[in-house]
């Protein structure tokens, strides 16, 4: 695990003590009050840093949505680039950083993150900037959300195997499905999307 700054350690201790005393996590304002500051922006930045380092998880839309991670169970996975949730886009495989998750969320080894670009999967609640947790596997079942390579370009879509073709279906009516007729194009499954992570502002 990455080392914490003095302020991050203080925030983590405040959360831990509050959980031990009250049985539920503190709000941003309660943390700010303990830190002796008036606003919550600084608290949010500390929580974001603690989440990136694998010490806690936050639940979007909840005033008390903080869960501490078991430090012995945390693991950091690489963010290996960008995948387009829209038109086909060349795959980018430069590691841009790492993101920590609990080991219990991994079904197998080799998993990695891709950052989502585009809006073709918005009805599946996948939006630009999300981190897609990808489990490498060479095949998929119907309705799986996958990262697929079509003629060397990557896309994130819902997978359907039909009689003589593969259909990669967007979850946005503004986009057309990608149809791969048998034998006409080279297509491969990079992996199945098994989780979506969104970093709160």
From Swiss-Prot:
Keyword check for Aminoacyl-tRNA synthetase: no
The keyword DNA damage appears for this protein: yes
GO biological process, one term: SOS response
Keyword annotations: Autocatalytic cleavage, DNA damage, DNA repair, DNA replication, DNA-binding, Hydrolase, Repressor, SOS response, Transcription, Transcription regulation
One Pfam family per UniProt: Peptidase_S24
Active site: 120, 157
DNA-binding interval(s): 28-48
Site positions (Cleavage): 85-86
Reactions this protein catalyses: Hydrolysis of Ala-|-Gly bond in repressor LexA
PANTHER family named in the record: LEXA REPRESSOR (PTHR33516), LEXA REPRESSOR-RELATED (PTHR33516:SF2)
Function field: Represses a number of genes involved in the response to DNA damage (SOS response), including recA and lexA. In the presence of single-stranded DNA, RecA interacts with LexA causing an autocatalytic cleavage which disrupts the DNA-binding part of LexA, leading to derepression of the SOS regulon and eventually DNA repair.
Similarity comment: Belongs to the peptidase S24 family.
Subunit composition and interactions: Homodimer.
Full protein name: LexA repressor
Organism, scientific name: Geobacter sp. (strain M21)
Gene: lexA
